[in-house]
Amino acid sequence: MKTVLIPIHDGTVTKNLLRTDFLATLKTAPNTKIVLLLGSGDVASYEAEFGVPEKVIVECAQVYNRADKVELLFSSFFKHSIPTMFMKIRQVDWYWNKGKYGLYFGSSLLRVCGRFRIWQQFLRIVNALEPIDPKVRAVYEKWHPDVVFAPTMVSRVEVALMRLAQKDKKVVIGMAKSFDNLTSKAYLRIHPDYLIVPNQTGTQEAVGLYHYPKEQIRVTGIPQYDVYATADCIEERIQFFEKVNLDPNKKTILYAPAGDWMNDTDHEVLGEILKWTEDDKLPNTQVLLRLHPTYESKTEKLKGHPNLYVERPGTHFGNLKRYQFDLNDVRHLASTLYHSDVVINTGSTLMVESCIFDTPVITLGFDGYTKRGYWQSVARYYSREHLVPVINTGGVPIAKSFEELQNLITTYIANPELHTEERKKAAFAVCGEIDGKAGARAANVVLQTLQQIK
């Protein structure tokens, strides 16, 4: 009997992986048990949804406790070595803009060094020195997995399990959680035996940034978007608008803020849009405000406006950070994107999902009523590596003022087919073919590996 150990870092991994064909395909492996390792959470609900006696086992080891100072130090060391513009923007936000110039220059030095092979080799030596939580080690020794599958390669538990497996000469398969992971979160401190990436850009990033062997990379697409290819993905229009308490006969703007941490002037922009719905600038128009599941936004204070409906997606457990997305939530998002006339956001991956449904999408490149320099402005977000290919297609225009925003909204409402081809290119650049099979392709990487294990 072979064993595949899969740590489940958070609810996003559950949504993006377990609720796709990934697990269903993986369960077809003969003489193989699959262990889903929860850090914390409701074991009973996971067993009810995913468990299969003697086949899919749910384990909860309580190993996701707050990292100690040593772990935080190691984590920061690797994180700041990600050699990208994305990381530079973060370092400016975290340090330079707060007057912490010493920390900025120190972290920038790590980022510059991160491009060099000799530095990456040094980091792997450093990585081997990080203490491993005894609970993680106990889980590994309990199951002695033949394969460790790391769905994000970011969490400290995943990194520890990858280390233990490599030391034990077992197979490690890593996966880039989303199309921005390799440039923002997942410094490849450990080279897995196989690396799953969503697109060809991910291949270029793994090879170019981290000198990862190209022949060990597998391109699968993005599993969490598989549901968008299913026939029952979209709710009927009348049913959807009844659910969100909006008028199906009006034009609908979906406003999707990423949270005040990313754009603290969203409330100013949304406030102006609501004013436009009251006069002849945007007649017969309503707004659906879709808050981020985990981040606060001052836009919520506009709740109560007659042309606004507010929702926060997902099921939350005590606070915003602990939440779950089930298939109904995913289908609701798909229906929201499909039935909206225009989507507005700030540098969010939601722009890609809008393009999948060929819904006109506008992204904000100005800061409400405030004039800010580049390094303080939301305009900087569009220099991040994962968004550059999307913006370059021309399918997602950047509004640089209130006037441009109003003109774009009016233009798209009047002519929704405008930039259809460009939106197709944007979706393909990130997702490849949306055929509903990305989860199965990711699982097949594991199945092929299991076949090679004696």
Annotate each predicted stretch with a short phrase:
Residues L123-N127, P131, P151, R163-I238:
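Active-site-proximal region of nucleotide-activated glycan assembly enzymes
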Residues W94, R137-R156, S340-T346:
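Short N-terminal targeting/anchoring amphipathic segment
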Residues K135, Y140, T294, K298-L350, ...:
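Donor nucleotide-activated moiety binding/catalytic core segment of transferases
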Residues I190-P192, Y212-K214, T349-V430:
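Catalytic binding pocket for nucleotide-activated donors in carbohydrate/polymer assembly enzymes
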Residues I8-T20, A150, M262-T265, G436:
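A short, glycine/small-residue-rich beta-strand->loop->alpha-helix junction that serves as a flexible
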Residues L18-A24, Y225-R322:
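Conserved catalytic-core segment of nucleotide-activated headgroup transferases in glycan assembly
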Residues P7, V35-V136:
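Conserved N-terminal ligand/cofactor-binding loop architecture of enzyme catalytic domains
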Residues M1-T12, G39-S40, A61-V63, L254-A258:
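Nucleotide-activated donor-dependent transferases that construct or modify glycoconjugates
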